From Swiss-Prot:
Belongs to the bacterial ribosomal protein bL33 family. HAMAP family: Ribosomal_bL33 (MF_00294). InterPro entries: Ribosomal_bL33, Ribosomal_bL33_CS, Ribosomal_bL33_sf, Ribosomal_zn-bd. It comes from Edwardsiella ictaluri (strain 93-146). Keywords: Ribonucleoprotein, Ribosomal protein. This is Large ribosomal subunit protein bL33. NCBIfam families: PRK00595.1, rpmG_bact. SUPFAM superfamilies: Zn-binding ribosomal proteins (SSF57829). The lineage of its organism: Bacteria, Pseudomonadati, Pseudomonadota, Gammaproteobacteria, Enterobacterales.
Length: 55
């Protein structure tokens, strides 16, 4: 069975709360770092989440 091209990534909150989301990303079509505006339930606001590696 072939390996998938998509890799797991972690989106970490820029608010410094430690909250994160996990998702997958196609490294071949999107080599740049991902930045999304998502809801942070700790501060109860929409903040920017930046891509980080899953350890």
């Amino acid at each position: 069975m072939a390996k998938g091209i998509r890799e797991k990534i972690k989106l970490v909150s820029s608010a410094g709360t430690g909250h994160y989301y996990t998702t997958t990303k196609n490294k071949r079509t999107k080599p740049e770092k991902l930045e999304l505006k998502k809801f942070d339930p700790v501060v109860r606001q929409h903040v920017i989440y930046k891509e980080a590696k899953i350890k």
